Amino acid sequence: MFAQVFGTCTFGLNGHVITVEVDISRASPAFDIVGLPAVSVKESKERVQSAIRNSGYFFPIEKVTVNLAPADLKKDGSCLDLPIAMWVLAASGVIPKEVLASVMFIGELSLQGEIRSVPGVLSMVLAGREAGISTFFMSPAVAGEALLCENVTVYAPRTLGELVEYLLGHSPMAPAKRREAAESKLSDVDFAEVQGQIMAKRAMEIAAAGSHNVLMTGPPGSGKTMLARRITTILPPMTREEALEVTKIYSVAGLFKAEDIIRERPFRSPHHTISMAGLIGGGTIPRPGEVTLAHNGVLFLDELPEFPRAVLEVLRQPLEDREVHISRVNASFVYPSDFVLIAAMNPCPCGYLGDPDHPCTCSDGEIRSYGRKISGPLLDRIDLHVSVMRPKYSELTATIKGESSARIAERVAAARAMQSERLSEWHMQNNAQMGHRQLRETCRLNAEGSELLREVFEKLHLSARSYDRIIKVSRTIADLAGTSEIKPEHVAEALSYRNMLPRRS
């Protein structure tokens, strides 16, 4: 007897509809799964058999062959347990095949028949909806996630037996309902808490307005981490499309635990011991790494020179292309990685080079070696280099608070609105996304600004990439000033942020 049903699995960040075909034939008892299953899928044989028996149903003592189509796509994970079990029951006559038409089953089965959650449900349901499927069965633990998709009906039985009884019409089951979205909580940090650091806060404002990368250099305790953790408070809110994209990433990574869509921009701060795979993604079927988990948000790398140089070098492609490419034998994966990089470091191993109150104890060789841990090509991809010095006592004890995040966010939002309108023809949202064509058409300098940039370009022997990034930052500074013209003072300020690593004078 033959039957087929729909399941799904994730491949990278996207879901793929899988047709599960089951054939039961008169032969020596066997249970085989074909169609390029991974080890985790092959293990489902034991889970499915035990779940069916322990739910009170008969598992065929015949040859059971399960085919997972398309056969050229490697299937991974335990998400196909439930559809395999349902089609075995249909093929053996326990439930009518008709009730399984145009529905999709997603979930892992325990040995007792409990339906368990799996990561990536949002991507799976989106794939099913695109294939014309509107009814889904899954664990109650992930029903809320599935309901983030519009125009779908989700049922959430707790066990295999409960699901079969509903399909046979023996017991009722109401569709799962979407819970009311919780109100967005206010951030517990604010730029008003940062005393002094005028230039560093200005750099953060420019970074947020144009989505530019920042490197802060300063002694221990100068406030670099404090500044970095507050940048999300001035970034504009995510659009629904951006929020859905971030939610899908966290769902596939198994990090989505909420009932509502992720609305706050991600802030990722990996430790400097992270591996290359942890940063960009890895595995047989690669899972998202930190650069993808920071998509549409911020990636903060504290103590930048402490990261292995090989790990830092893999940042070059995502910083340039805003996506990361991972190749495997059977396929290539492209993950989004459009983030703002905020990096922080000490100026030397002891941390006090250039500090007027603490003498530096490092030798010239140690300082040079420390600076060489970060390659020139990586530094070239960082738009804003800012020195952060320890605040003075008078600044720390001042009763007048600094400018609030809300005030800064208003200026950032106005600048982003100008950029979005100016770049709408190319479907871009911010200045950092501009290419050569957009730079030529939207970022013309007057004669005075061009001459200033030419002098600095020739004196410092800047690269073409540095030239482009200076123009982009100048454009953002002009946007914050509310002017369509890039003036010499905007270019001058942008040039002031091209400082390289400090050296002993």
Sequence positions of predicted segments:
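Peripheral, non-AAA+ core regions of ATP-driven protein-machinery
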Residues: 1-215, 219-225, 327, 466-467, ...
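Short beta-strand elements
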Residues: 18-24, 279, 383-386
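Basic, amphipathic alpha-helical bundle interface domains used for macromolecular binding and assembly
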Residues: 37-45, 58-60, 67-77, 286, ...
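Alpha-helical scaffold elements adjacent to nucleotide-binding pockets in ATP/GTP-utilizing enzyme cores
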Residues: 47, 51, 84-87, 123-127, ...
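Short glycine-centered helix-capping/turn motifs at secondary-structure transition points
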Residues: 92-93, 169, 254, 296, ...
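Short, well-ordered beta-strand core segments
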Residues: 136, 299, 383-386
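Switch/coupling sub-region of P-loop NTPases
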Residues: 189-202, 208-213, 242, 248-313, ...
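Walker A/P-loop
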Residues: 216-255
